[in-house]
Amino acid sequence: MSFVHKLPTFYTAGVGAIIGGLSLRFNGAKFLSDWYINKYNDSVPAWSLQTCHWAGIALYCVGWVTLASVIYLKHRDNSILKGSILSCIVISAVWSILEYNQDMFVSNPKLPLISCAMLVSSLAALVALKYHIKDIFTILGAAIIIILAEYVVLPYQRQYNIVDGIGLPLLLLGFFILYQVFSVPNPSTPTGVMVPKPEDEWDIEMAPLNHRDRQVPESELENVK
């Protein structure tokens, strides 16, 4: 199986890394504390909690980079998409440097907020990748679902300890819609333009019409005489 056929697997891994990173970042410390108390009857070391926080952020960022790489490989000849991915990387790097100077960044990292800005800044580029109005509105709807689930519904569920909420299904639905839209590349030519066939196909189709090169059996020659 070629690497291109494995892109859905990498896409699924990227989505899993994003969801796992969010879970580890916001719920990992609580889970680790409960497990540590039940097993050792003691509080969790501070370094373990910090490791849990930063591991979640690392997974989150790796997931976004994986998703961007998969979409880029599916549309590697599209300069707009390539520029949008590079722009998002630059924006996230600059934003990280600026927020790192704040004291609150150490105790409450804001890196997940960067992904929201990356999504919004990428909307124009993503919309430009599609020619049809239906695809454009589908992309906008998927982006709204992802932002709503990740920054409204999921934080609300964590705040009120809602276990079986709709946040995670909404997040998965948004990513699934985006994948379905971008799973089929854009046609390289506008609608209505005839695409020339390869030379070998023309030769095969035109072979019966090439009477000069056709060898006539002797029986047919006798009938002609």
UniProtKB/Swiss-Prot annotation:
Name of protein: Transmembrane protein 022L
Which sequence ranges are marked TM in the entry? 2-22, 53-73, 80-100, 111-131, 136-156, 162-182
Compartment(s) where it occurs, according to its Swiss-Prot or TrEMBL record: Host membrane
* Lineage: superkingdom: Viruses
List, alphabetically, the GO terms of the cellular component aspect: host cell membrane; membrane
Q: Does the keyword Protease apply?
A: no
Topological relation to the membrane, as annotated? Multi-pass membrane protein
Q: Which residues form the signal peptide?
A: none
Keywords assigned by UniProt?
Host membrane, Membrane, Transmembrane, Transmembrane helix
